[in-house]
Amino acid sequence: MARVIGDLARPNCPGGPAVIGISEVENERVVRDLVNTSPAKEMNLKYVHYDSPDRRGIDVALIYNPRLFRYTKSSTHPLIIPDNPNFKTRDQLLVEGTMAGEHVCILVNHWPSPYGGAKSSPLREAAAALSKHIADSVRTANPSAKVIIMGDLNDDPKDASVAKVLGATRHKKDTPADGYFNATWGLYDKGIGTLCYQDSWCLYDQQILSANLLGKPANGLSYWKTEVFNREYLVTPDGKKKGYPFRAFNGNIWQNGYSDHFPIITYYVKQLK
């Protein structure tokens, strides 16, 4: 996995990614070992991690390059379901800092599982409502703050949690000034996904941006493009799952892969004065 981090965003960004949101994190030691393994180690990365109440014992975390993202503060936000007080899942992680001289707030997510189909949708809709509340609160407190919502949302861009509750738009032109744009919806429209289930691609891994990231580079930090990172070594080379993400386990068999999800990369640009 350290190899993936070392390769992400290159060659467009020779210094590598500024921030990386990760999920399915067992504990802090896993993140610490990851950033201290070559080639990630040579990037001198830092991280933010908190334990979550999730019953599986998994968390989210943010890895960042302190040369590109100057960390300021962080907080975690639990998902509480009033009608189901015993439900436990991953907290949402808010990390604030400075990137390219601007105030940027990053919300890392891993929304509840899609297992159960429509019956589990209300849980992800509740997670979406929490994400929107956090993002809106940040922007109310500081209207110039640029907000990035990222993570494994366990829903596609068109699903109600993302498109209706969070209100993430399909097209830039349809994004209101106080709204959010789904930078991954265009990929989904092209049939591109980050995970494959029964030969059908899903795009659960998404990045959603506040509208003030949609301006011109001459006026500040701005969105450029999003892509799925699916280098050859991340793809299953043969067998029934050929073309799928090359996961670590195939059933109970260790196959020395990486993940059942491909990462996504979103690029931001700013014109130098």
Where are the model-predicted features located?
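Active-site beta-strand/loop signature of hydrolases that rely on acidic residues for catalysis
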Residues: 4-32, 63, 106, 131-163, ...
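Second-shell loop/turn segments in exported
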Residues: 16-22, 49-50, 81-83, 114-124, ...
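Extracytoplasmic/secreted cell-surface and envelope-processing proteins
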Residues: 29-32, 56-59, 115-118, 156-161, ...
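Metal-dependent phosphoester-hydrolase catalytic domains
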Residues: 87, 137-147, 155-273
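Alpha-helical scaffolding within the catalytic cores
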Residues: 3-4, 89-93, 192
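Structured beta-strand-rich core segments of catalytic domains in phosphoester-bond hydrolases
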Residues: 19, 25-103, 109-112
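Metal-dependent phosphoester/phosphodiester hydrolase catalytic core
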Residues: 99-129, 133
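N-terminal, active-site-proximal structural segment of metallo-dependent hydrolase catalytic domains
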Residues: 1-42, 46-60, 237-246, 250-252, ...
